[in-house]
C-alpha cells in the first residue's frame, strides 16, 4: 500500500535532534563545537547561545514579551519554548547574533561554503541546504524558498527569483540570499 502525503508541516524537532547528533559526533557540547569550527574562525564575535554570559543586558535588544511561559519581556534568553526547555541551547533556536555576523554566514553560503579564502562547508552541502527537496514543501534542508506554484504564498516577495533562499526567525527576524543578483539581506 502506497502512502500519499499531500501537505507538509513546519517542525523544529529535526533541528533539535540534529543538535544532539552534532554533540554525539563531535564529542563536545554543540555550542563549543560551533564556536571552534565556525564562530571563532569566521570572526563572528557576537554570535552564540545564552548571550548574557558574555554581554551586558543593555547590549541585547529585548525580543518579545512572553505572556505564556515566563510571563516577562525576554532579553538575552530564547523566545522559542522548546529551546527554552533545553536551557536555551538547542539545535532549533536560541542563537543570538548581530546583522554583521549573520550576513557573514549568509555570504559564506552565497560563496558556496567559503569566505575570506577559508572553506567551512562543501559546495555540495550548500547546494543541498538551499535547493528545494520536496514536491510538497518549498523548503530546502533548513532554508525557505519561493513557492514555484504560487509566488504570492510563502515568505518571499512574488518577484523573487527561484534561486532565493533564507530563513525567518520566531521573533520576526529574517535573512535571505539572492544568488542571481549576489545579494545578502538581513533584518533583525
Residue ranges and their predicted role:
Residues 2, 6-163:
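Short, surface-exposed loop or secondary-structure junction motifs
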Residues 21, 176-177:
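Hydrophobic beta-strand positions
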Residues 142, 174-176:
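Short, surface-exposed charged micro-motifs
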Amino acid at each position: 500500500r502506497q502512502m500519499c502525503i499531500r501537505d507538509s508541516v513546519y517542525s523544529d524537532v529535526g533541528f533539535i535532534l540534529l543538535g544532539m547528533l552534532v554533540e554525539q559526533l563531535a564529542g563536545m557540547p554543540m555550542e563549543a563545537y560551533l564556536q571552534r569550527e565556525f564562530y571563532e574562525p569566521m570572526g563572528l564575535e557576537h554570535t552564540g547561545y545564552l548571550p548574557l554570559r558574555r554581554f551586558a543586558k543593555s547590549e541585547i535588544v529585548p525580543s518579545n514579551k512572553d505572556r505564556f511561559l515566563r510571563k516577562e519581556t525576554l532579553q538575552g534568553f530564547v523566545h522559542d519554548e522548546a529551546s527554552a526547555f533545553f536551557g536555551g541551547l538547542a539545535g532549533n533556536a536560541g542563537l543570538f547574533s548581530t546583522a554583521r555576523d549573520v550576513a557573514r554566514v549568509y555570504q559564506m553560503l552565497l560563496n558556496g561554503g567559503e569566505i575570506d579564502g577559508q572553506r567551512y562547508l562543501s559546495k555540495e552541502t550548500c547546494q543541498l541546504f538551499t535547493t528545494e527537496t520536496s514536491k510538497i514543501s518549498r523548503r530546502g534542508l533548513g532554508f525557505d524558498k519561493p513557492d514555484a506554484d504560487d509566488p504570492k504564498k510563502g515568505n518571499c516577495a512574488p518577484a523573487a527569483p527561484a534561486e532565493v533562499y533564507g530563513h525567518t526567525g520566531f521573533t520576526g527576524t529574517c535573512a535571505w540570499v539572492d544568488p542571481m543578483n549576489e545579494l545578502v539581506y538581513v533584518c533583525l
